[in-house]
Every structure is written in C-alpha cells, then in structure tokens.
Swiss-Prot record:
Species of provenance: Nocardioides sp. (strain JS1661)
Claim: Lipid biosynthesis is one of the keywords in the record: no
Keyword Hydrolase: yes
Protein name: 2,4-dinitroanisole O-demethylase subunit beta
Coiled-coil boundaries: none
Function, in words: Involved in the degradation of 2,4-dinitroanisole (DNAN), an insensitive munition ingredient used in explosive formulations as a replacement for 2,4,6-trinitrotoluene (TNT). Catalyzes the removal of the methyl group from 2,4-dinitroanisole (DNAN) to yield 2,4-dinitrophenol (2,4-DNP) and methanol.
Catalyzed chemical reaction(s): 2,4-dinitroanisole + H2O = 2,4-dinitrophenol + methanol + H(+)
C-alpha cells in the first residue's frame, strides 16, 4: 500500500490586467500588478527587489518593468518577505541567479512546501532585527512577531524613509483575513508604523502616509473589537453568515463604510473568520504569548538540518 501523495496547488496563470511602476524617492520605486504591490531599490551596483509576485505573467511583467526603468542594471538581491505564494511563489524564475534573502521561519515553510518555483533563500536571517547591505542599500529586516503568514518581514529602508510590509491596507479589502495572526498583528504592525517612515508600502492596495497608516490600524482594531462583542454578547448566532453580517455592518458602517472596498457581505465573511479566531483561541503557536516556540518546531529544526548538510557539502546555496 502506498502513502497518499501531497500536492501543492498553485493559482493558474492569467494575463496581467494592470501594472505600474512609480518613483517614491530618489532610488526607491513601487511596482503594482493587479492589486499586489512591492518595492525595488536602485543600488550602486544593482537592483534590490522585494518578492516576486505569484504567477508567471505577473513575475514576467515585474521583470519587464524593472528593465524598462533601470536598463541593464542587474537584480543582485531579492528579499522574500513572506512565505505566501501569491507574493513569493515565483522567486526562482524571477531571481534568475540573484541572491535570495528570507527569514528562517518563512523559509522553513517554503522548504516543507517543496515548490520548485518558490526558491529557497541563499541567505537566511533569524530573530527580530537583522541589518544587511546589498549594492550600497542598507536594509533592516524586522520580524516583531507573527502578523501575516509565517516569518513575515518588514523591510525597512531607513536611509530612504520607506518601509514595506505585507498585511495592513489602506482600504477594507481584507477578504477573510487569510493567515492573519490577531494575537500580535496590531501590536507588531504598530511597532513598524512607529518607525515613522514617510512611506508605508503594503503588499496590497495603495502606498500609505502616516495618517493613512493610523486609520488603517484603527479600522482593524475596531473590526477585531466588533467581532469580540459579537461573540461575547451571546445573542448573535456567530456561526451563520447573515446574522454576523448584519451585526458587524451595524457596528462598523457609520464610521467605516467610506473606506475603499467596504462591502457588508465581505465584512460578514471576514467577521466569521475573526469570530472563529476568538472562539477557538487563535491558531497554533503564532497566536499565543509564546510564539518564539515556533523556532523550536520540527519543521524549523528539519530546515536547519537541511542547511547544515548544504554547508557541509560546501555549496551553501539552496
């Protein structure tokens, strides 16, 4: 008898509908493709890019925009800021030999997933703060706590007054808040916002200034609190979409219905997920007071052993 084979299902490719690249500072540009967003930095000897997008067409368009803007200047380093495939699922083809940098926790997930296109990092950082320099660009890679996904990094560019981080958005298009870790999300994201950078670049939606970041944090806080009241009040059948939608819309609409993407049904769907978060006490170690235990999980230990074998073999590259 053979064991059941596990398969990673990836999103089908689709034509790019909308793609732009625009300048934020002297050397930092933001790329937006069909609702997703990232940044690239023009260093002295090459380009430092963040993430790869998640489909072949988006990854190809990303490369085209870089070439159109910077000519034959090579991409020398790519930071994989998160484990999610829609942001980093095409690291291998996009990096094309460039150094890939990622956080140990996110890389352990990618290692366990085993998707060839999601190339593993050549340089692995760990812990809450790591400062590196590539092509004359100073990057501070910050991991304050679980926020979204696993090993989600804030890529801080202090010399450029820019920070990039997947999670927070300027509007209300959060859907079901996939893989958000509400135990730490607001505190950790607020810690990054407190850096006071001129530009806060999210992984989706529009670039935000300090005022928009404060508003975005307040919306998520109000959403979480409304979901807590929905559960704790004991009067709403919170396992059903319609009554949950009605309750949350009544709680939130007067203050937040002006947000781009606000929709009562979407609020209800997201609310079901968040209420379940509180009802069940969160998800796994990420949503506990002791999230540092993630570093001792079997997946992470196995990934470390894999890297040790690489080092012993003398390759050092994934």
């Amino acid at each position: 008898m053979t064991g059941r084979q596990r398969t990673t299902v990836v999103a089908p490719d689709r034509p790019v509908q909308d793609a732009t690249i625009s300048q934020l500072t002297t050397r930092v540009w933001t790329v937006a493709i069909d609702g997703y967003r990232t940044i690239v930095v023009e260093g002295e000897t090459g380009i430092v890019a963040i993430n790869s997008f998640g489909t072949p067409s988006a990854q190809t368009k990303y490369r085209e925009l870089i070439t159109q803007t910077f000519g034959d200047k090579p991409v020398v380093a790519v930071v994989a800021s998160i484990d999610h495939l829609d942001h980093t699922g095409r690291l291998g083809p996009f990096a094309n030999g460039a150094e890939v940098i990622g956080h140990e926790l996110g890389q352990a997930i990618a290692f366990g997933r085993g998707l060839p296109e999601q190339k593993l990092a050549d340089t692995v950082v760990t812990g809450p703060v790591t400062e590196i320099e590539r092509a004359g660009v100073r990057l501070v890679l910050r991991y304050p706590a679980p926020t979204v996904g696993t090993g989600n990094l804030a890529v801080d560019l202090p010399d450029d007054d820019v920070v990039f981080m997947v999670g927070l958005q300027s509007g209300a298009r959060y859907g079901i808040f996939p893989d958000f870790h509400f135990k730490h999300f607001l505190r950790a994201t607020s810690e990054i916002a407190a850096l006071g950078r001129r530009y806060f670049v999210p992984g989706r939606s529009e670039v935000m200034d300090a005022g928009q970041v404060r508003q975005a944090l307040e919306y998520v806080n109000d959403f979480q609190n409304a979901c807590q009241r929905c559960l704790a009040g004991g009067e709403v059948p919170h396992w059903l979409l319609e009554p949950t939608t009605a309750y949350l819309h009544d709680e939130l609409s007067s203050k937040w219905s002006h947000l781009e993407g606000y929709d009562p049904v979407a609020v209800g769907l997201g609310g079901l997920r968040v209420v379940c978060h509180y009802y069940m006490g969160g998800w796994w170690l990420d949503d506990t007071d002791h999230h540092e235990l993630l570093y001792d999980h079997l997946t992470v230990r196995t990934y470390r052993e894999y890297r040790e074998r690489l080092a012993t073999a003398g390759t050092g590259r994934a």
